[in-house]
A protein has these predicted regions:
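A short, conserved structural fragment
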Residues: 97-104
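A short acidic, leucine-rich amphipathic alpha-helix
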Residues: 74-80, 93
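Short alpha-helical segments that sit at the start of domains
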Residues: 32-58
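Residues within the DNA-recognition helix of helix-turn-helix
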Residues: 89
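Short amphipathic alpha-helical interface segments
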Residues: 55-68
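Key DNA-contact positions within bacterial/archaeal DNA-binding proteins
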Residues: 84-85
Length: 127
């Protein structure tokens, strides 16, 4: 079974531009992403990274991975946090593809709920 990993990089705009060009050329040649990662996220400095992966958001990722909540509401209950705050954090993490949100509907339910999933085996941070 293939390991699914993503990489987070801290780099300047110039380094980012150079990486985009390099990645584009590698992709055109059919070569895999750097280090065979499925996703590479880049941030200009540590302050950006600390906003995206704050301690609370890391706790969300860990709870999704370990407890596999069926909805954002259930995740909020596991965390002991307000559902609205958890929902914002979950949507931000999903925007960066760190977690996935799947629409699900239980038998007998009228409306769909969003089921958060963490489908990575791990991630690396390069500073």
């Amino acid at each position: 079974m293939r390991v699914r990993k993503f990489k987070i990089k801290i780099q300047s705009q110039d380094q980012f531009r150079d990486d985009v060009i390099k990645t584009w050329k590698m992709t055109e040649k059919g070569k895999p992403l750097e280090g065979d990662y499925d996703l590479i996220l880049s941030f200009p400095d540590l302050s950006w990274l600390s906003k995206i992966l704050s301690p609370e958001r890391l706790r969300i990722i860990q709870t999704i991975r370990d407890k596999k909540p069926e909805s954002i509401y259930q995740l909020a209950k596991f965390l002991g946090r307000a559902p609205a705050n958890v929902q914002k954090d979950v949507h931000d993490l999903a925007e960066y593809k760190i977690i996935e949100l799947k629409k699900t509907r239980k038998k007998g339910q009228k409306r769909e709920s969003l089921h958060p999933e963490y489908n990575w085996d791990g991630f690396d941070i390069a500073v």
